A protein has these predicted regions:
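Terminal targeting signals and extreme-terminal segments of soluble enzymes
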Residues: 1-283
């Protein structure tokens, strides 16, 4: 995930239009390692909604190959219908990611009530949990320097097997109004910011039964796909609760899902993801 402010994140998600259907994302200064999955999701939404008036109702993205964060990414959009877009991402002539995006107005309806959990002020800041886990000050700085403020209901920073679920309060550290994404014309960027964030912690639920803190050394993990459905506008600079779980994890695969609520209890988005999990051989 990106270091820096909300301005840095919106700059990352913004694309240069080569044509009305082809876009490029240039690498950021200091980029290294592979492309974070949420970057594909957020940039894919920005590409798909270019020139669109309607918000995104749903998308489903498939991760095909890892991307090199030091090289440009090229986004090609095909307009399948008035409200249906397909996005394909290439790097050096290799297909990395595909996404189907559906546009449409929100439709409110009764849903699963928000879990009864403590509010964000009573929860564990992410940087505190990381500091309790290890002494790598550079990693801790990276968490503090994130565009997002995260507050965890459960203490996940241990290597004891735990139930495959947790709850996280989150919001951007800076106001959306100060970054020109609070008005109606900023709705696509708000959705892209949420899609970018939603890929961050949802995978962890499949790892908790293995002892989350020790899983990263024992397991190799990667996202296979990610889907989201938007039920209402997304106020990314106010507290949102991401209630997550993993209904099944076995045979090298893990299924995870998340419900995202306003603090008032309104369900604003639903997410689902499948991941690949392999035991590391240490070679």
């Amino acid at each position: 995930m990106i270091h820096g402010s909300l301005s840095d994140l919106t700059a990352l998600l913004s694309l240069e239009a080569l044509t009305d259907e082809r876009f490029v994302a240039e690498p950021r200064s200091g980029s290294r390692w592979r492309v974070y999955g949420g970057q594909f999701l957020g940039q894919g939404l920005i590409a798909a909604t270019h020139g669109a008036d309607l918000p995104v109702r749903a998308f489903h993205g498939y991760f095909i190959r890892a991307g090199n964060a030091t090289q440009p990414l090229f986004y090609q959009v095909e307009r399948l219908s008035e409200d249906h877009r397909q996005v394909r991402v290439h790097q050096e002539d290799k297909l990395l990611f595909t996404m189907e995006v559906v546009l449409g107005e929100y439709g409110s309806a009764p849903g699963i009530p928000m879990p009864d959990v403590p509010g964000p002020d009573a929860c564990i800041p992410r940087e505190k949990g990381i500091q309790n886990l290890q002494t790598d000050t550079e990693s801790t700085w990276a968490v503090v320097d994130s565009p997002f403020d995260n507050r965890f209901v459960e203490n996940i920073w241990h290597d004891v097997p735990a139930p495959p679920q947790h709850h996280v309060w989150f919001r951007t550290r800076q106001s959306a109004a100060k970054h020109d994404i609070s008005a109606m014309e900023g709705q696509h960027m708000r959705q892209a910011v949420l899609a970018y964030y939603a890929d961050d912690t949802i995978m962890d639920n499949a790892l908790f039964p293995h002892g989350w803190a020790g899983s990263w050394e024992r397991l190799q993990t990667t996202s296979l796909d990610h889907a989201m459905w938007f039920h209402a506008d997304v106020p990314v600079d106010t507290w949102l609760l991401h209630a997550q779980d993993s209904p099944t994890a076995g045979g090298g695969r893990g299924m995870t899902r998340g419900l995202i609520y306003r603090q008032s209890g309104e369900l604003v988005a639903t997410a689902a993801q499948e991941i690949l999990m392999r035991v590391s051989t240490g070679r």
